[in-house]
Curated annotation (Swiss-Prot):
NCBIfam families recorded: AmmeMemoSam_B
Gene3D superfamilies recorded: LigB-like (3.40.830.10)
PANTHER family given in the database record: PROTEIN MEMO1
CDD domains, sorted: MEMO_like
Annotated source species: Aeropyrum pernix (strain ATCC 700893 / DSM 11879 / JCM 9820 / NBRC 100138 / K1)
InterPro entries assigned: MEMO1_fam
Protein family membership: Belongs to the MEMO1 family.
Domain of life: Archaea
Identification of the protein by name: MEMO1 family protein APE_1771
Intrachain S-S bonds: none
Length: 281
């Protein structure tokens, strides 16, 4: 059995179970977070098609990510979470799937859904099994403890990281995800993670972030890429963002911003900041 051990415990988030739970709960109760703890184990509401959370260290983006997971907690528990993020390392394939085994965090193990992953590979024509793209990547790893806090180990994952940020890849993955749900009846939610603009002064960074969030809410994946290109927005995950938007379009659902902040709002350091979204689709 393949095991992916945590690569960023102790850096992006605490390395011990006790401290990690405290950090997650602090994210929920933080002034920039939802302000309350989530319902654990799943709720009775309608689950979203997709979410777009950030993926920085918990001390920076944890409170904004918590808005996503609070909202998720109100809906019925998914059996499968398709995790989609940007590949920051440059290793691996254009779209890399970790296809079997388990992922570990300080909160325990989560099983990879091999059959759902196989279907995404088949349907997308671009996603392929590849461990190398995942070994040191943080964008998906930081989502797992939040999911484990909600559901324990009672869900499976399909982890995909995208190296080539293109509209075509976004559309292919979104359509594969749509078929997974609609043709195969898989009770799944897509968690497509990206940070927003990077490393500009507070006001300029915020201006670019709000332009991108407006494009996301339009519900058109092409508008996401056009806005990023037209305004030189350095979001790290255009493909995950656009895939979530396209998944919503296919299901007849428009994105809705749950929360937004940047690192300057958290730390008070505004010389250069990074933007963090929380979006429900």
């Amino acid at each position: 059995m393949k095991i992916r051990n945590p690569a960023h415990a102790g850096t992006f988030y605490p390395a011990t179970r006790e401290e990690l739970v405290k950090s997650i709960e602090s994210s929920f109760t933080h002034p920039l977070g939802p302000g309350r703890l989530p319902q654990r184990g799943g709720g009775s509401g309608e689950q979203a098609i997709a979410y777009i959370p950030p993926h920085a260290g918990y001390m920076y983006s944890g409170p904004i990510a918590a808005h996503v997971y609070y909202d998720m907690s109100l809906g019925r528990k998914p059996d499968v979470v398709v995790l989609l993020g940007p590949n920051h390392t440059g290793l691996g394939l254009a779209a890399s799937l970790w296809d079997e085994g388990v992922w570990r965090t300080p909160l325990g193990e989560v099983e990879v859904d091999s059959e759902a992953g196989r279907l995404v590979v088949e349907y997308s024509g671009i996603v392929a099994p590849d461990d190398e793209g995942h070994i040191y990547e943080h964008s998906l790893e930081v989502q797992l403890p939040f999911l484990q806090y909600l559901y324990g180990g009672d869900f499976r994952i399909v982890p995909i990281v995208v190296l080539h940020q293109t509209l075509d890849i976004s559309i292919r993955i979104a359509r594969a995800y749509h078929r997974l749900r609609e043709e195969n009846g898989v009770n799944a939610v897509l968690v497509a993670t990206s940070d927003l603009n990077h490393y500009e002064p507070y006001e300029e960074n915020k201006r670019k972030d709000l332009l991108l969030l407006k494009a996301i809410e339009e519900g058109d994946p092409e508008a996401v890429f056009k806005t990023i290109e037209a305004h030189a927005i350095s979001a790290c995950g255009p493909s995950p963002i656009a895939a979530a938007v396209e998944a919503g379009r296919l299901a007849g659902v428009k994105p809705r911003v749950l929360a937004y902040a940047n690192s300057g709002d958290v730390t008070g350091e505004k010389a250069w900041v990074v933007g963090y979204p929380a979006v429900r689709v």
